[in-house]
């Protein structure tokens, strides 16, 4: 039982170290892509829907929203949540490396529980 716990704990440490370096690379790539997208957006004309001094901006994660298209990021969706009996819609990141790492940790914890039995 102790051996099983030690093996899984060492796996978690390896995944945490690997994911942090992968996340740093991913953030750097996203930041670079954002710069390129911003420059290319400046070259195009504004949409017909945007009038006057109004400009479109995206809603950050965990802020209220109405539609998926309002949220920032490719894997971010406008998802409904229930808070104190009221339904609210929040922008949430539903994909990416973090979700995969958390899923791996959840599977590892379930393996530890099965080792104890």
UniProtKB/Swiss-Prot annotation:
Single GO MF descriptor: toxin activity
**What are the UniProt keywords, alphabetically?**
Disulfide bond, Ion channel impairing toxin, Knottin, Secreted, Signal, Toxin
For the region Disordered, what residue ranges are annotated?
20-55
A cellular-component GO term for this protein: extracellular region
The answer to whether keyword Zinc applies is no
Q: Which residues form the propeptide?
A: 21-56
Cystine crosslinks: 58-72, 65-78, 69-115, 71-91
Task: Spell out where the chain crosses the membrane.
Answer: none
Is Lyase among this UniProt entry's keywords?
Answer: no
User: Domain of life of the organism in this record?
Assistant: Eukaryota
Q: Which positions carry the signal peptide feature in this UniProt record?
A: 1-20
Please list the residue ranges that the record marks as compositionally biased, kind Basic and acidic residues. 23-55
Tissue specificity remark: Expressed by the venom gland.
Q: Name its cellular compartments.
A: Secreted
Free-text comment on this protein's domains from its UniProt entry: The presence of a 'disulfide through disulfide knot' structurally defines this protein as a knottin.
What does the protein in this record do? Putative ion channel inhibitor.
Q: Which family does it belong to?
A: Belongs to the neurotoxin 03 (Tx2) family. 02 subfamily. HNTX-XV sub-subfamily.
User: What name has this protein been given in UniProt?
Assistant: Hainantoxin-XV-2
